[in-house]
Curated annotation (Swiss-Prot):
Origin species: Corynebacterium jeikeium (strain K411)
Entry function: Catalyzes the NADPH-dependent reduction of glutamyl-tRNA(Glu) to glutamate 1-semialdehyde (GSA).
Residues where substrate binds: T58, C59, N60, R61, S118, E123, Q124, Q125, Q129
Entries under HAMAP family matching the protein: Glu_tRNA_reductase
InterPro entries recorded: 4pyrrol_synth_GluRdtase (IPR000343), 4pyrrol_synth_GluRdtase_dimer (IPR015896), 4pyrrol_synth_GluRdtase_N (IPR015895), GluRdtase_CS (IPR018214), GluRdtase_dimer_dom_sf (IPR036453), GluRdtase_N_sf (IPR036343), NAD(P)-bd_dom_sf (IPR036291), Shikm_DH/Glu-tRNA_Rdtase (IPR006151)
Annotated binding of NADP(+), by residue: G214, A215, G216, A217, M218, A219
Compositional bias of kind Polar residues: 461-477
Region feature (Disordered): 461-486
Top class in the EC scheme: oxidoreductase
Protein name in UniProt: Glutamyl-tRNA reductase
Length: 497
């Protein structure tokens, strides 16, 4: 295979670990903190096998993109590095790792950037995460031409998919699906007031309160959908309070009563809400079992703040988990995490075919670009060789024509350069076209294609009689050269022939 992502004998090697291949606990342990990414990327290239590295670390995947000149030794080094930084044993990791090489690695990054490989299909956050991963690796100095080109193509592909298809609605579908499931566990608040009693069926959350933890895309979708379901009040908690306040402002503009609190204010809010939606993407639990038990106790068992008894629903849309798994064991609490929701959603997914068509189109374009670039070093070497031959011929000319005027000499040099440029221009262009196409051709066909020889020209010089004459002339030239013992005179014969 003429791998498009190959540079000389090197190819892109991807080793990954994601929600599809590994349990949550392993993903959480393998996650690399932002502060450690530069050190890890440098460790990946600290050998003779790998020349480039980029680590993509998100809430539900760890992917290690490298450029390796040998597959097996490159793979061993990447796996050993993952084990070193995660503290996991190689034997523990290997069953859960996936590997892509050359063109397959390029295709995978394009799919990831498009949201096609995400737990929530179509989520846009991955584009920013990939951009940040590239910037980190670039600043560390571990990104070269190959990973630069691949990442830029992936970012372009992701933007096209989100602007040209309806895949974004898939993320909204997951949030709405999660809240639809939550409605199964929340008792209608019909007896609270005349206003609630008259609330339309389309607003089943009238009289209820919600807490949203996080202020990203998923949190924003949750706020919007809660408003449509008639929620009375939304509290938004986030590490950066200004982002929480921005989301609150959007909610208020949509007619939803809302307020913002810092992330450390979450525990104080738990007892006053019926629904919790968490989507921070943080490493480590934001809400613990102890927090929830205290909140349930403060609310009088499973009684809500409004005085009615019902289930407190906690929706965890993060990976790694924001909400401690053992919360599910608390009476009166229903925990819905992203893994469970994905399984329950089943076929409720957006049509991915338009997005996949864009990925295929961008991949093909990228492969052609990379194949065309792969011939550049050879073209440069060819031009360098031609320059050396021309220089030798000019030196020989100077020895043979010491009386030639400077004007004539300059004219000869200019003429020779023109001849070399004209001879090499067509094969340079054709070589890039042939490489981009990726088709296999015979040596004679390749030579004819490189020099763009007209159809029939090769046949015309190999007609019966002409071929014999050509062969005889070639043999004669070789014989004359063989008869000249001096190496210095060989060049003269070639010049005179």
């Amino acid at each position: 295979m003429s791998g498009s992502t190959r540079t000389g004998s090197a190819s892109v090697l991807l080793v990954g670990l994601s929600f599809r291949s590994a349990p949550v606990t392993m993903l959480e342990q393998a996650t690399v903190a932002d502060a450690d990414l530069p050190k890890m990327q440098l460790s990946l290239v600290d050998n003779d096998v790998i020349s480039e590295s980029l680590v993509l670390s998100t809430c539900n995947r760890m992917e290690f993109y490298t450029v390796a000149n040998a597959f097996h030794s490159g793979l061993d080094h990447v796996v050993d590095t993952i084990a070193q930084f995660s503290g996991l044993q190689t034997a523990e990791l290997e069953p859960h790792l996936y590997v892509h090489y050359a063109d397959s690695a390029a295709e995978h990054m394009l799919k990831v950037a498009s949201g096609l490989d995400s737990m929530v299909i179509g989520e846009q956050q991955i584009i920013g995460q990939l951009r940040s991963a590239y910037q980190s690796a670039n600043e560390t100095g571990t990104v070269g031409r190959t990973l630069h080109d691949l990442t830029q193509r992936a970012l372009r592909t992701g933007k096209r998919v989100h602007s040209e298809t309806a895949i974004d609605s898939a993320g909204a579908s997951m949030v709405s699906f999660a809240l639809d499931q939550a409605l199964r566990y929340i008792e209608p608040a019909r007896a609270l007031s005349a206003v609630v009693d008259d609330a339309p069926l389309s607003q089943p959350l009238a009289g209820h309160r919600a807490l949203i933890i996080g202020a990203g895309a998923m949190a924003s979708l949750a706020s919007t959908h809660l408003g449509k379901l008639g929620i009375d009040h939304v509290t938004v908690a986030n590490r950066t309070l200004s982002r929480a306040e921005n989301l609150v402002n959007h909610a208020r503009q949509a007619g939803v009563d809302a307020s913002a609190v810092p992330l450390d204010g979450v525990t104080d809010c738990l007892s006053a809400v019926d629904i919790v939606v968490s989507a921070t993407g943080a490493v480590g639990n934001v809400v613990t079992e102890q927090d929830v038990r205290a909140a349930v106790g403060a609310a009088g068992g499973v009684a809500s703040v409004a005085g009615r008894r019902g289930t407190k629903v906690m929706i965890d849309l993060s990976m790694p988990a924001d909400i401690e798994h053992s919360v599910a064991e608390i009476d009166g609490v229903k925990l819905l995490n992203i893994e469970e929701l994905t399984t329950m959603a089943g076929d409720r997914v957006q049509d991915e075919s338009p997005a996949r068509a864009i990925v295929a189109d961008e991949l093909q374009s990228f492969l052609e670009q990379q194949r065309a670039q792969s011939v550049v070093p050879t073209v440069k070497a060819l031009r360098q060789k031609a320059g050396e031959v021309m220089a030798e011929e000019l030196m020989a000319l100077e020895r043979l024509t010491p009386d030639m005027s400077e004007a004539d000499r300059a004219a000869v040099v200019k003429s020779m350069k023109r001849v070399v440029d004209k001879l090499l221009h067509t094969p340079t262009v054709q070589a890039k076209k042939l490489s981009a196409g990726g088709q296999q051709v015979s040596y004679p066909d390749a030579l004819a294609a490189l020099f763009n020889l007209p159809n029939g020209m090769v046949d015309s010089v190999t007609q019966p009689g002409q071929a014999d004459s050509s062969a005889a002339q070639t043999a004669g030239t070789s014989a004359r050269a063989d008869q000249i013992p001096s190496a210095a005179r060989v060049g003269r014969v070639v010049r005179e022939a």
